[in-house]
């Protein structure tokens, strides 16, 4: 209201200040639709101000603030336009601090839409400037987004290395500071550390980082941070096969996205929750949640998790006996993973295709399992390597090749036991028992 009256009185400076304050307040409580409305009005007000370096700096700041609320709403097309405009403004006035900020968010945008090479380039440029400026907020943001990109590419070792640096930079009270981001980067870094370490089978470390993310988020009671904390814990349990522990955390994360109007944020939750439901026989529920999420993921929103969602849906279709659909979806997952250079999900899709082929085409299944295993070994994806050994062992058992079956099943059992993957260990032990 104050901004409205200031605007009508052509007190544009005051109107801008009021709108920025209102937008920040709405953003702080995750009222992103309200924040967007404030920042869009602020952009209109800026057009009435005389052109100067200070006005241009404000124009960058408002665009970046607007981008912060558009992302949880999944409005990606608007975001890239804002980033283009903000980068041009920062370059024009030689503002390196703001340029680094824009470049780091550009890296995040490219991660979101599955263009990781472009994202890495933008992220490295942002980090280089941040290091030169010795700016902790800029270093933390650029490094986190680079960690996200490495995770997406299946380079889990690189993701872990850079994300652990972010955690080390933000001890004690700094862990609770947002540093200009939507939630504390200490929460974000721990969430993706949990994802990355879980993919390598380091579940104890993954769960520890996930629990830390949730603890920091709970202390602030902030929806965006809470979502990340719950999905971190739930995803690790799901990848481990601890479905009883995974489902409550993931269901809570999904509720947060719905209750807080963050429709663009439920991609990883849907993938892992659907997988968890499938493992305990709730196949219809699994299909429903994954199909709903898939429909949304293919709209103008996040593409980053689409390959993972497709892998999960294909596996659930297989569990439900929908073989033809499973193969179609898994083939799409493989194609998209390869196009987006998501090597971890490429290996996962090949494993799912092996599981599908094992029903009717043993020779093809063997090739799929071996290809998936080779790539998973290269990437350090120990749980997936174990799944491939289990698949090969079952395949050889059905073919009457007891010796090879024994070798692969024993390897799977050893790996599952070392990683404390009890759900999968019991499956493998049952198959070994069938050889007697």
What kind of feature is each model-predicted range?
Residues 12-21, 134-148, 264-265, 323-329:
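Short, charged, low-hydrophobicity "junction" segments
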Residues 28-29, 133, 320, 379:
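Charged, alpha-helical scaffolding/interaction elements associated with membrane systems
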Residues 12, 32, 76-79, 116, ...:
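Flexible, glycine- and charge-enriched loops at secondary-structure boundaries
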Residues 40-237:
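Internal alpha-solenoid helical repeat scaffolds
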